[in-house]
Every structure is written in C-alpha cells, then in structure tokens.
Amino acid sequence: MAKRVLVVEDNELNLKLFCDLLRAHGYAAEPVRDGREAVARARDVAPELIIMDIQMPHVTGYELILELKADEALKAIPVMAVTAYAGREDEERIRGAGADAYVSKPISLARFMEAVRGLE
C-alpha cells in the first residue's frame, strides 16, 4: 500500500506539483488547500508524512507544526516544511517548532524527493 502524504499548500500550482511528483513516485498524496483544515484532515487521513508550506493565509505552517506536535495522536508524524524563508534563523525557528525536514523554495524536484525519502 502506498504511503499517505498530506500536502498542505495554499498555492494551487505548488500543490499540484507536489502531489503529482509524490504520486509519480508511488505515494498517495492528499491535498489540503487551507491550513485551517490540516489538523482535522491529518486525523482523518492518518498520513505517514505531512508536507506543508510555511507562508499561508489564516494560519501559518509554523503555527500548524506547533499544533500538530502538541496533539498526542499526530505528534509522531514527520513534518517537512517547504518555504521561501531561506535564512539560517528561519530554518532553526521552523525546526525548533518540530519540523523534521526543511526545504527552501525555489524547489529542486530531486532535493524535494530526497527530503521525502529521508523521512521514511
């Protein structure tokens, strides 16, 4: 059975790219367009990995990571942050919130998949 990956991204083009890339590599990608739905969807889908943008309207990926890691049922799920924030301080802050991997935009498809595989 394919590993389930929840992809939380408000940009439709990036969401499609990430989901298509994951599916092409044998993963079952579940898209979420609004960060406000991410925790409920994670409970429903029970993914093996959550990939999320950090810059989103309504709720940031940073806030979502904190919420996921505070939830007993979800805290063990690895989180990969995808962000335009490329500074060392940004990465430390995001990892400090609980992200298990960090990939900066613009995305290298090979690097993206390498980070995904590194969380298996």
Predicted regions and their residues:
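Conserved acidic carboxylate
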Residues: 9
